[in-house]
Amino acid sequence: FGMLMSLARDIPQATASLKGGEWNRSSYTGVELAAKTIGVVGLGKIGREVVQRSVAFRMKVLGYDPFVSEEAANSFGAQLSSIEEVLENSDFITLHLPLTSQTEHFISDEQLSQCKDGVLLINCARGGIIDEAAVVRALDSGKVGGAAFDVFEQEPPQNSALVNHERVICTPHLGASTREAQVNVALQVAEQVGEILTDRIIRNAVNVP
């Protein structure tokens, strides 16, 4: 959600400008989140957390996830919508999908052409679910007003037009890089090893049918 707020208020750009010796308030007029529409693509654990924070900021939330029921989406504050409805009506779009053969370049030229002019785009999920070259084209044309990326098709990115674009906020895959998150991961690993050794249920296995 920090990416969303930074994107809405041009915080990194304004910081760099001030540190560069400028006092240029007029160039960094942002937008408020209240009353804006955010499209949350992927309503798993992280997507639901984003929905709840968006509701707290009085945003209208459209959610897309083919595996979530309308009742479930409504229960945590999202209006379940088709991907077309999300693209056409959202001021902000944030993606929270795994990278699979079905989701690779889930957002590309065709999908971006359906968006509102000036849409703000966020990817803190997985590199590759958004076509970076398509985003650069959309930024250059003004179709996308700004973007925030924490993940990339190539990590670390090399000579990336996306990273170097003036209207892109980017961080080096920091989504889970908090002290608390790292401690929690270690605890979960230890708990799961204990469960396996005591013949209890195996959770989150990627190689069990």
Q: Predicted regions: what is each one?
A:
Residues 1-37, 49-52, 201-205:
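Phosphate-binding beta-alpha-beta segment of Rossmann-like dinucleotide-binding domains, i.e.
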Residues 4, 90, 139, 189, ...:
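Hydrophobic "lid"/C-terminal helical patch
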Residues 62, 66-161, 177:
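Rossmann-like adenosine-cofactor binding region
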Residues 58:
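Short glycine-rich hinge loops at helix-strand junctions in the catalytic core
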Residues 51, 55, 139-140:
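Gly/Ala-rich phosphate-binding loop of Rossmann-like dinucleotide-binding domains
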Residues 43-44:
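Glycine-rich Rossmann-fold phosphate-binding loop(s) that bind the pyrophosphate
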Residues 13, 29, 151-209:
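C-terminal helix-to-coil terminal segments
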